[in-house]
Amino acid sequence: MCIRDRYCAFQLALGNMGTAGGGANIFRGHDNVQGATDFCILSHSLPGYYGLSAGAWKHWSRVWGEDYNWLKARFASLKGKDGKTKSLMNQKGIPVSRWIDGVLENKDNIEQPDNLKAMVFWGHAPNSQTRMKEMKVAMEKLDLMVVIDPYPTVSAVLSDKTDGVYLLPSTTQFETYGSVTASNRSLQWREKVIEPSFDSLPDHTIIYKFAKKFGFADRMFRQIK
């Protein structure tokens, strides 16, 4: 963190802040975190940081070649505290740091019809967050918990839950191919170095299998050959 602060202060002293083409690169903590947020693994926005307005959904409906009304029908509605009915389509979701509240909090306080019943931890270890005691309780209250990682993380061993827990082994970066986004927003392509170990699968294969099981793989992958 000190290095990041000093780098920004240095750029400020050089006059490179607040100017066209200036600024400092965003330092991210893990490989391709920038690409993940650009692609929108977020609870509060569509890809490209478009937000969740009706206009944003209509834009991405056109990009995806999807019917806007079909997408809209996939979301539940909820009557807010102001008495107005709101579609969850336009409401910010629960951030990863507070998913615990989605399980343990009274559902009248979480602005969605029901509490969370299932969680998928995909490339995420909860020991990077606080409230571990509450997290353990929340995990044990879930009906379903899925952990997707190259190796078992704290997500897989924190709770004493004995059923409804699945560990899906994913490949490492050396066992698959694909693009990553550097902190300067440049794209880099990586080739597969070795074959996947044991039964592990690349992330894109796992998500395809999920989509196929849920019945919308044809829609999700229609533009991917």
Predicted features and spans:
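Short, small-residue-biased leader/transition segments that mark boundaries at the very start
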Residues: 1-3
